[in-house]
C-alpha cells in the first residue's frame, strides 16, 4: 500500500513478473526474478489478501492498494526454496524506459551485488575507524563496538550527498504521523553532527555542509532560519532560534581545529562575517549592548528583563534550545558568545599571511573594527 495517495492520483500496472505502482513523479516496482505471477489484484485487495485469495481481471487501475502472489509449489520438510523479490524505486519516467529498467534489474546477479555491497561498507567502516577500536574480547566490548560501527554507518544516511545538508534523525514514516518529524536540517543540530564526523575522519562530508549547504541557506541579512530540507529549501518553521546562526560560526572554527586548513577558513570567512554582523545587530536590538561598556550582574539582568518587555524590536525574539519558550536564554547567549570567540580565533588563525589580506587596508580595518566591537 502506498501511503502518499492523494485524490486517487496513484495508479498500478501489472508488468512482467510483478507490478508497478506510480504517481506523477515517482514509481515503485515490485517484481520477482525467474518467477511468473500466480495472481494479482489491483483494486480492493486490502481485505482479500488476508485470506490469500486475490484475483482481478484488470491489468491497470487507480489504486494505492494492490497485491501480487507467486506459486512456490510444495515445500517439503527440510527443503529450501528461494524467491528473489526486487523493489525498484525510481522517478516516473515513460513506460518503455521503466520496463527496460525492470528488465535490466532482473538480469543482475544479486549474490554478486550483495558481496560487493558488503565489501564496500566493511572498507568504509575500516576507513573511518579513527578511534582504532580493536575486535571485542568480551560481551561488553562487543556491544560498544557494535554501536560504534553502526554510528559510522549511520552518518551517510543523514547527509544529502549533493548539498551536504544533514538531517537530525532518519525517518521511515513518509506521512510523519508515527515519528518525531526529525528528517529536516536544523543548522545547530547539524553542526554537532559534523563534530562527530570530524572525529570519524569524514572531512569531505563536513566541509560540504559548510561550503555548500550553509552558504546556500544563509539569508541576506546573515542569519539562518530554524530548519531546512536537505536540498536547501526552507522547511516549515514555527519561530526563530538565534543559536542556529551562532552555531554555524562555532562549527566552522571547530572543524578547522581538526584539519588546520586555512583554505577552509578563507572559503567560509565571508559567510561567518555576515553571521557575526547579524548577531551583533541582534544583541543590540534585544539587550541594547554597545561597545565595551562594563555592566555588573544585576544591571545585565535588569536590562534583559526590560528588553523582553519592550515593544518595537527589529528582530523576533528567540526560542530556547528545545523550542519550548520564547525569551533570552542562557544557552542562546552562550552560543552567541561562542560565535564571537570563534570569529576572533578565525582571524587569529588566518593572521596577515593570507594573500587576500596583504596590502588590503580596507579589509584589515574592517577586521580590526569587528574585533574591537566583539571584544
Regions found by a protein language model. Give the residues of each.
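Extended hydrophobic/Leu-rich segments
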Residues: 2, 12-14, 20-26, 31-32, ...
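Acidic/polar, glycine-enriched structural segments that form the non-catalytic walls/loops
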Residues: 2-181, 262-263
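Well-ordered alpha-helical scaffold segments within catalytic/enzyme domains
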Residues: 87, 128-142, 153-157, 191-203, ...
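Extended, well-ordered alpha-helical scaffold segments
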Residues: 98-120, 143-150, 201-216, 262-282, ...
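Solvent-exposed loop and edge beta-strand segments that line ligand/cofactor-binding
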Residues: 120-127, 134-140, 172-190, 197-198, ...
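N-terminal start-of-domain structural block
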Residues: 161-162, 168-186, 212-218, 222-223, ...
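Catalytic cores of carbohydrate-active enzymes
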Residues: 182, 221-228, 288-375
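Aromatic-rich carbohydrate-recognition surfaces in CAZymes
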Residues: 182-290, 297, 303-304, 333-337
Amino acid at each position: 500500500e502506498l501511503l502518499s495517495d492523494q485524490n486517487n492520483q496513484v495508479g498500478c500496472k501489472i508488468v512482467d513478473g510483478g507490478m508497478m505502482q506510480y504517481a506523477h513523479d515517482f514509481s515503485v516496482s515490485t517484481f520477482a526474478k525467474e518467477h511468473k505471477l500466480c495472481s494479482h489484484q489491483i483494486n480492493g485487495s486490502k481485505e482479500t489478501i488476508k485470506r490469500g485469495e486475490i484475483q482481478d481481471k484488470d491489468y491497470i487501475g487507480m489504486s494505492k492498494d494492490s497485491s501480487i502472489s507467486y506459486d512456490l509449489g510444495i515445500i517439503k520438510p527440510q527443503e529450501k526454496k528461494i524467491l528473489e523479490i526486487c523493489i525498484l524505486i525510481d522517478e516516473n519516467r515513460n513506460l518503455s524506459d521503466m520496463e527496460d529498467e525492470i528488465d535490466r534489474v532482473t538480469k543482475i546477479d544479486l549474490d554478486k551485488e550483495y558481496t560487493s555491497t558488503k565489501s564496500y561498507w566493511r572498507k568504509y567502516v575500516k576507513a573511518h575507524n579513527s578511534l582504532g577500536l580493536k575486535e571485542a574480547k568480551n560481551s561488553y566490548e562487543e556491544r560498544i563496538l557494535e554501536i560504534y560501527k553502526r554510528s559510522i554507518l549511520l552518518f551517510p544516511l543523514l547527509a544529502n550527498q549533493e548539498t551536504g545538508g544533514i538531517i537530525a534523525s532518519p525517518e521511515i514514516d513518509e506521512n510523519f504521523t508515527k515519528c518525531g518529524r526529525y528528517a529536516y536540517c536544523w543548522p545547530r543540530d547539524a553542526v554537532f553532527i559534523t563534530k562527530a564526523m570530524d572525529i570519524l575522519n569524514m572531512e569531505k562530508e563536513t566541509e560540504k555542509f559548510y561550503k555548500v549547504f550553509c552558504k546556500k541557506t544563509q539569508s541576506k541579512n546573515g542569519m539562518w532560519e530554524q530548519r531546512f530540507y536537505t536540498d536547501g529549501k526552507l522547511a516549515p518553521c514555527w519561530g526563530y532560534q538565534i543559536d542556529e546562526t551562532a552555531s554555524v560560526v562555532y562549527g566552522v572554527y571547530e572543524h578547522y581545529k581538526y584539519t588546520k586548513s586555512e583554505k577552509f577558513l578563507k572559503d567560509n570567512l565571508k559567510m561567518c562575517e555576515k553571521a557575526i554582523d547579524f548577531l551583533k545587530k541582534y544583541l543590540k536590538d534585544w539587550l541594547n549592548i554597545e561597545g565595551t561598556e562594563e555592566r555588573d550582574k544585576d544591571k545585565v539582568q535588569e536590562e534583559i528583563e526590560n528588553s523582553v518587555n519592550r515593544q518595537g524590536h527589529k528582530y523576533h525574539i528567540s526560542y530556547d534550545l528545545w523550542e519550548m519558550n520564547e525569551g533570552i536564554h542562557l544557552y542562546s547567549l552562550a552560543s552567541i558568545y561562542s560565535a564571537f570567540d570563534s570569529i576572533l580565533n578565525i582571524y587569529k588563525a588566518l593572521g596577515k599571511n593570507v594573500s587576500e589580506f596583504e596590502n588590503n587596508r580596507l579589509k584589515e580595518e574592517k577586521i580590526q573594527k569587528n574585533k574591537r566591537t566583539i571584544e
